[in-house]
Each structure stands twice: as C-alpha cells, then as structure tokens.
Regions:
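Enzyme catalytic cores with a strong preference for nitrogen-chemistry domains
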Residues: 1-262
Length: 262
C-alpha cells in the first residue's frame, strides 16, 4: 500500500504539490531525514508507521502479545526520525543579529478584470500602485521595516519588459519609489519572453534596481493554466478570466557580496 501511494503521488499530477511528509515540518528533529530521501521518504515512513498501527489494531483481539511486534514497528519510524534529527540538526548559533522586519502590504483591491472594464487599464494600475505606495510609505517610515512585500499580482502587467511607453514610465516610477524607500521590494507582476507571459515575482533593490524575477513553476489549473486539450475558443468564452501563463523554471539565483549586495 505504501509503495502504491508513493507511485501514484509520483506519476499522477495533483492540483497542489503537497505530500504527507510536509506535516513533519513543524518538528525540527523529525524533518531532518528529508536530506536522505526527500519529502517522499518522510511520507513513506509515515505510511509504514500507520500500516503497522493498523495491523496492531486488527490483531488486538488476539491479546497483548500479538500487538507487540506491529506496535514496535509502528513506533520505530518516528523514533528513528527523532534520533537521526538529534544527530544532524544544526545548532542554532547565539547571535545578537536583529531579526528581519518585513512589511506585508495587502490593499484589499480585488477583481482587477471588473475594475479594468469599468475604469480602464491605466486607471486601474494607477489606483493599485498609488494605494501600495501610500501603505508602503507608512510601513517604511512609521513601522521601520527592512523590506516591503506587495502580495499577489500588485503590478498587473509586465515589469522590466514594458509593452508601451506608459508601461516603461510606470516601471521607472516603481524603481524610483524603491530608491526613495531605501529598502528592497518584492512584488507580484508578469514576465515576458518569446514563449509567452509568466506569473512572476520581481525582486527590486534600491541600489541595483531589478535584481531578478521568479517565474511561478506550478500554475493553478483552470485559473492560471489550461491544458491544451481543453483550451479553445469555447472554453475561453465560457471562462474568460482564465489565465494563459506559461510555467516558469523556478527561483533565480544571485551572487551576493560580503555586505549583502547582489
């Protein structure tokens, strides 16, 4: 049963890339074994432990002796995880470093498509950005944050690859806001290349501007991505809000200097 479960998780696409092993994340010791077999290995151990406990329950009418072996096997997996984690878990260094304070900006502006139809694309972008500018100013000047995070797709057009002169001006405006704030910004936007558009997150610093873009690699089915066999004019007419983004390759990497600059 455990092998079948793991095989199905590996071969069948799921809406979300979750697995039972993720449930061990809150335990600093039990999650360490992921360096040996990944999250799938943790899932396998959890399933084996549950199979052993189920076998013990099935044998309980036969008395205590019949329970001992499956119970021992069921408890062995979590004990092994704890023991291994105790040996390899990193010791938290004693440091006086200040924790990173991040300002999460949530404007509660929703349904961009409806707003675009009612106000026009440029007016909507203007409203979204002005709202985030004001909230970011409060976060930087009054809350003294070290970085600012604009949640969701705050900038609903391509950043760094403007499609128009107005888009290029908005890009420069955002860069100017980041320079004035003197802290890094991360925000949702779109990216563009010859293959199409990507749902992305932009990393912008005061010193260097656009540091890089993360292209989302796991798109949400029927919202951000439609399988080719299902896509078509009829589908788009019935669900016009469905996205057409491409799947990205994951997180970018940047070299940093000794003072933290990329």
């Amino acid at each position: 049963a455990t092998a079948a479960w793991l095989a199905v998780e590996r071969l069948m696409q799921k809406m979300l890339g979750d697995t039972l092993g993720y449930g061990l994340y809150p335990s600093p010791l039990m999650r360490q074994a992921a360096d040996l077999a990944g999250s799938a290995g943790l899932t396998g151990l959890l399933l084996l432990s549950n199979e052993a406990l189920a076998a013990a329950w099935a044998q309980h009418p036969q008395g205590i002796r019949a329970l001992l072996k499956p119970l021992a096997l069921g408890l062995a997996a979590p004990l092994l995880l704890l023991v291994y984690g105790g040996f390899v878990a990193p010791v938290s260094p004693i440091t006086d470093a200040k924790p990173l304070r991040v300002g999460l900006i949530q404007s509660n502006l929703v349904d961009y498509e409806r707003m675009r139809k009612e106000q026009g694309a440029l007016a909507v972008v203007r409203q979204i950005l002005d709202t985030h500018y004001a909230m970011s100013y409060d976060a930087v000047e009054h809350q003294r944050v070290d970085a600012v995070l604009w949640s969701e797709t705050t900038y609903p057009t391509t950043f760094g690859h403007p499609k128009s002169q107005a888009g290029a001006q908005l890009d420069q405006e955002i860069l100017g806001i980041v320079r004035s704030a003197r802290v890094p910004f991360v925000f949702g936007t779109y990216d563009l290349d010859d293959n199409g558009e990507y749902n992305a997150a932009a990393f912008v610093t005061p010193q260097q501007g656009l540091l890089g873009l993360y292209r989302k690699s796991r798109l949400f089915p029927l919202t951000e991505y439609v399988p080719p066999w299902l896509d078509g004019p009829t589908f788009r007419r019935l669900l016009p809000w469905t996205g057409t983004w491409q799947a990205g390759s994951g997180a970018p990497f940047a070299k940093t200097t000794h003072n933290g600059q990329a």
